[in-house]
Regions:
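Glycine-rich, basic loop-to-helix element that forms the pyrophosphate-binding segment
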Residues: 81-100
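Active-site-adjacent helix/loop segment of glycosyltransferases
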Residues: 6, 143, 233-315
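A conserved hydrophobic helix/loop-capping motif in glycosyltransferases and polysaccharide synthases
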Residues: 3-15, 19, 26, 36-39
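Short beta-strand-to-loop acidic/aromatic patch adjacent to the donor-nucleotide binding site
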Residues: 104-116
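Short, acidic, metal-binding catalytic loop of nucleotide-sugar glycosyltransferases
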Residues: 21-31, 52
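Short, flexible, basic/aromatic active-site loop/helix in glycosyltransferases
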Residues: 158-201
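A short, conserved alpha-helix in the catalytic core of glycosyltransferases
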Residues: 193-253
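Conserved donor NDP-sugar-binding/catalytic core segment of glycosyltransferases
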Residues: 116-154
Length: 319
């Protein structure tokens, strides 16, 4: 059987190409690429990416538009072109739709396009995943851009209502280091020491993780109601409700460059999106009551106003 690699591309074909090149250098496991262009606004992105894939994989590559008929069996490489940027969750769902259709794919690896493979970890992660009935999701240890520092986001505890409230209160001024302390409590790995054994985690990094296709489909994979942020929190809640766990395999590593897609969006848009996702997550998955939700709504609204004014005055001073 085969692992389907779903890579989301948005205005960053160079990152996607670098990601694929890194995989091709080290991987020895049977795979299929499903690259989703998530409505790139730059008209040169899709042609450049498609030309690269055709040159690299020749007849083993196809280009699909969003409404094209899905082949029963996908080739080695598929580039799916989406008309609109629908965000992380919905963009990946488009790739998952293709993977679900292909009976040769039994395992799915979700990868950010700014991830660089340094280890041949697909086969080992598959073994860990399929040999443990309690586990639905596995992830390698993820390093930051420098290739040495551990990205603590790869092993986290789930965000609580208290944490979300504190985040939006102290994000502009972390009085007494309250937010920093709460963030430290959120991270399972804080000392940059590589763990000697596998770690059960509540929340993985969305930049690189592996799941069993059938189980991922059963929990309805990503929630389409978020555009950006809180996708991992929601995924963690779904997996927990299903009675399964997430596992970090620290023996194998990859590098996450970070910020490739979000840097191409305005600061106000990103902040507003994070607020919408936080409200949705708190209401549906943390199941907060009416009073707690109103408190969250007021605090996030004030935080957004502060953010907009701060950006406005910063631009005025800069100009």
């Amino acid at each position: 059987m085969t692992t389907g690699l779903i890579i989301l591309n948005y205005n960053s074909s160079d990152d996607t190409i670098n990601c694929i090149e890194s995989i091709e250098r080290v991987n020895t496991s049977p795979i299929k690429y499903i690259i989703v262009d998530n409505g790139s606004s730059n008209p040169y992105i899709v042609p450049k990416l498609n030309d690269y894939l055709k040159s690299k994989f020749a007849s083993k590559h196809i280009l699909l538009n969003e409404n094209d008929k899905i082949p029963d069996i996908l080739p080695y490489s598929t580039l799916l072109v989406s008309k609109n940027n629908t965000g992380y969750a919905c963009g990946n769902k488009k790739g998952l739709k293709l993977a679900y259709h292909d009976k040769e794919i039994d395992t799915i690896l979700i990868i950010n396009n700014d991830v660089i493979f340094i280890d041949d970890f697909i086969s080992p992660l598959r073994r860990w995943l399929w040999n443990d009935d309690k586990t639905m999701l596995v992830s390698p240890l993820i390093l930051k851009r420098d290739g040495e520092t551990i990205d603590p986001n790869c092993a986290r505890r789930k965000k609580t209502y208290r944490y979300i409230i504190a985040w939006f209160i102290f994000i502009f001024s972390d009085i007494f280091g309250i937010l920093r302390k709460m963030q430290k409590e959120l991270f399972i790995i804080n000392n940059n020491e590589i763990p000697s054994q596998n770690i059960k985690i509540e929340m993985p990094s969305g930049s690189c993780f592996m799941v069993k296709k059938k189980e991922f489909k059963q929990i309805d994979d990503f929630d389409p109601n978020t555009f950006l942020y809180y996708e991992e929190d929601i995924l963690s809640a779904k997996i927990s409700d299903y009675g399964k766990q997430c596992l970090l395999i620290p023996t194998y590593t990859c590098i996450h460059i970070g910020g490739s897609s979000t840097n191409k969006r305005s600061s106000n848009f990103i902040f507003r999106t994070s607020i919408e996702s936080a409200r949705y997550y708190a209401k549906k998955y943390l199941k907060v009551g009416f009073t707690k939700y109103i408190i969250l709504y007021i605090i996030t609204s004030l935080s957004l106003i502060t953010h907009i004014f701060k950006n406005y005055f910063y631009k005025r001073i800069k100009n």
